[in-house]
Amino acid sequence: MSRRCELTAKGAQVGHKVSHSNIKTKRRFLPNLVNVTFLSDTLGRAVRLRVSTNALKSVDHRGGLDAYLLKAREAELSPKAVELKRAIAKKMAGEPVAAAS
């Protein structure tokens, strides 16, 4: 399982740990990821995603998962999130949606 947010595509970054004597050693800055169950009002079901706490704050600010996904670019979403976005858009357009596995 990769350390990447499924909504914002935030991943691990590489930098230096700097000691008091200014010796630099490589280290990784990992994103703060949490497993969250969102409720989709449009689809009427729960969706489980692994997201960063920053994305969690953004989803809350936008007014829910549906609003966040519809506004987000597909390039920065995971394949699972893109599938959800398309299902939400299709449902809002009035077309029947097949159940996602």
From Swiss-Prot:
SUPFAM superfamilies given in the database record: L28p-like
GO biological process: translation
GO molecular function: structural constituent of ribosome
InterPro entries tied to this protein: Ribosomal_bL28, Ribosomal_bL28/bL31-like_sf, Ribosomal_bL28_bact-type, Ribosomal_bL28_sf
A GO cellular component entry from the record: cytosolic large ribosomal subunit
Gene3D superfamilies: Ribosomal protein L28/L24 (2.30.170.40)
This protein's UniProt keywords: Ribonucleoprotein, Ribosomal protein
Disulfide bonds: none
Keyword NADP: no
Family: Belongs to the bacterial ribosomal protein bL28 family.
PANTHER family, sorted: 39S RIBOSOMAL PROTEIN L28, MITOCHONDRIAL, LARGE RIBOSOMAL SUBUNIT PROTEIN BL28M
Protein name: Large ribosomal subunit protein bL28
